[in-house]
From Swiss-Prot:
<dbReference type="GO" id="GO:0046718">
    <property type="term" value="P:symbiont entry into host cell"/>
</dbReference>
<keyword id="KW-0687">Ribonucleoprotein</keyword>
<dbReference type="GO" id="GO:0005198">
    <property type="term" value="F:structural molecule activity"/>
</dbReference>
<comment type="subunit">
    <text>Homomultimerizes to form the nucleocapsid. May bind host exportin-1/XPO1. Binds to viral genomic RNA. Protein-RNA contacts are mediated by a combination of electrostatic interactions between positively charged residues and the phosphate backbone and planar interactions between aromatic side chains and bases.</text>
</comment>
<dbReference type="InterPro" id="IPR002141">
    <property type="entry name" value="Flu_NP"/>
</dbReference>
<keyword id="KW-1139">Helical capsid protein</keyword>
<keyword id="KW-1160">Virus entry into host cell</keyword>
<keyword id="KW-1048">Host nucleus</keyword>
<keyword id="KW-0167">Capsid protein</keyword>
<feature type="short sequence motif" description="Bipartite nuclear localization signal">
    <location>
        <begin position="198"/>
        <end position="216"/>
    </location>
</feature>
<comment type="similarity">
    <text>Belongs to the influenza viruses nucleoprotein family.</text>
</comment>
<dbReference type="GO" id="GO:0042025">
    <property type="term" value="C:host cell nucleus"/>
</dbReference>
<dbReference type="Pfam" id="PF00506">
    <property type="entry name" value="Flu_NP"/>
</dbReference>
<dbReference type="GO" id="GO:0075732">
    <property type="term" value="P:viral penetration into host nucleus"/>
</dbReference>
<keyword id="KW-1163">Viral penetration into host nucleus</keyword>
<dbReference type="GO" id="GO:1990904">
    <property type="term" value="C:ribonucleoprotein complex"/>
</dbReference>
<dbReference type="GO" id="GO:0019013">
    <property type="term" value="C:viral nucleocapsid"/>
</dbReference>
Length: 498
């Protein structure tokens, strides 16, 4: 479970471990990313990629997707039972980009899934290393969070597109386990539950029979995960109501949407992990770094330090701005898509601009795009400072619930206020306080009305110099308190479609 009741750190969820001490956790996370690195090096050898080609983020993503597809049991089974034209269920592949005569060319590669599984296991001491696979899924999810908007998905489930800051992890596959559940935003969990309830409304047999029993267990599990993300008693009590409903229907959907809105101010605990592309771990392993011996953490200085010393390239379309492409990938690497731009800019040491002002499309290149005009450039992924990633949502201690902004889910544990437009959010709460959950709703609304946009979250927490690996001297930045800091303002990004 990702609820806070089971006090396992993210790294333990990530590595499937039971309670371990800090050193053991660092070692097992190190083992996990080291395995990813070894796998990547082997794949580059198999594909005969040059050093430069191996550092290309698009090639890294293709290789990551191949291994995720090779281990996707459910889909593999489905593909074998429903053979479709032109798809070999036993093979996986994707575009590999190579440098030829001063130009980039795309080449489609195909591999036996069995072969990929063999290489992956070999790189991971003969084990399946599911934790490493989940880690790659979270990196892809963080990249999607920074790249695409989910307006359409929000509207489809009856939520407000301005609730985008609650949608972290909305593209994570179902099989991403406890580590995946920990990084999902409140909106993502609400959306999964609403989809489920809607199916139950439309399909009489959804909750019935042997299958229905399994469905019910999944429903209650998701409710518990969401409950564990809320930090106030009233929100949790409402989740109990939703979970215990005999026959979930529109009343539950209403309650869930109410809870999602309330999370804009009474924020949920959502974990943040810096998951880097496989090629970054590959580069470190190739240079002789021993992750398992040195230990590694996804929430401390390690990913920052790794990115300081890694040179990664990206393909650039003719009218894209390489600096903007770098910002996109930097945000993805630190899971900072929903962080306040003031904080991100301070840590990165260069101004991080809202997405509407970025001249760049996604990192992946569609198969119909013209390679003739493609160029490549170095991604600038270094930072000025580092900060500890948070899982708290940044509610201040007085109320255990503080100010939110229509668009911040803090990533870094750094002191700041979380500005928000109370009028905008509260406008959504007029009317309906009747029904079973009326007292909880009233209580939640009261807490929200008492929240002040100027309250300081993460009191006394600061950023650290990159030389300060033990985090001894926090530098507490001072921010312009009134300044809005959301990445999604005036947004014109593409929609995420599978």
């Amino acid at each position: 479970m990702a609820s806070q009741g089971t006090k396992r750190s993210y790294e333990q969820m990530e590595t499937g471990g039971e309670r371990q001490n800090a050193t053991e956790i660092r070692a097992s996370v190190g083992r996990m990313v080291g395995g990813i690195g070894r796998f990547y090096i082997q794949m580059c050898t198999e594909l005969k990629l040059s050093d430069y080609e191996g550092r290309l983020i698009q090639n890294s993503i293709t290789i990551e997707r191949m291994v995720l597809s090779a281990f996707d049991e459910r889909r593999n089974k489905y593909l074998e039972e429903h053979p479709s034209a032109g798809k070999d269920p036993k093979k996986t592949g994707g575009p590999i980009y190579r440098r030829r005569d001063g130009k980039w060319v795309r080449e489609l590669t195909l591999y036996d899934k069995e072969e990929i599984r063999r290489i992956w296991r070999q790189a991971n001491n003969g084990e399946d290393a599911t934790a490493g696979l989940t880690h790659l899924m979270i990196w892809h999810s963080n990249l999607n969070d920074a790249t695409y908007q989910r307006t359409r998905a929000l509207v489809r489930t009856g939520m407000d597109p301005r609730m985008c800051s609650l949608m972290q992890g909305s593209t994570l596959p179902r099989r991403s386990g406890a580590a995946g559940a920990a990084v999902k935003g409140v909106g993502t969990m609400v959306m999964e539950l609403i989809r489920m309830i809607k199916r139950g409304i439309n399909d009489r047999n959804f909750w019935r029979g042997e299958n229905g029993r399994r469905t019910r267990i999944a429903y209650e599990r998701m409710c518990n995960i969401l409950k564990g993300k809320f930090q106030t008693a009233a929100q949790r009590a409402m989740m109990d109501q939703v979970r215990e409903s005999r026959n979930p229907g529109n009343a539950e959907i209403e309650d869930l949407i109410f809870l999602a809105r309330s999370a804009l101010i009474l924020r949920g605990s959502v974990a943040h992990k810096s998951c880097l592309p496989a090629c970054v771990y590959g580069l470190a392993v190739a240079s002789g770094y021993d992750f398992e011996r040195e230990g590694y953490s996804l929430v401390g200085i390690d990913p920052f330090r790794l990115l300081q010393n890694s040179q990664v390239f990206s393909l650039i379309r003719p009218n894209e701005n390489p600096a903007h492409k770098s910002q996109l990938v930097w945000m993805a690497c630190h899971s900072a898509a929903f962080e306040d731009l003031r904080v991100s800019s301070f840590i990165r040491g260069t101004r991080v601009v809202p997405r509407g002002q970025l001249s760049t499309r996604g990192v992946q290149i569609a198969s119909n795009e013209n390679m003739e005009t493609m160029d490549s450039s170095t991604l600038e992924l270094r930072s000025r400072y580092w900060a500890i990633r948070t899982r708290s949502g940044g509610n201040t201690n007085q109320q255990r619930a503080s100010a939110g902004q229509i668009s911040v889910q803090p990533t870094f544990s750094v002191q700041r206020n979380l500005p928000f437009e109370r009028a905008t959010i509260m406008a959504a709460f007029t009317g309906n306080t009747e029904g079973r959950t009326s007292d909880m709703r009233t209580e939640i609304i009261r807490m929200m009305e008492n929240a002040r946009p100027e309250d300081v979250s993460f009191q006394g927490r600061g950023v650290f110099e990159l030389s300060d690996e033990k985090a001894t001297n926090p530098i507490v930045p001072s921010f312009d308190m009134s300044n809005e800091g959301s990445y999604f303002f005036g947004d014109n990004a593409e929609e995420y479609d599978n």
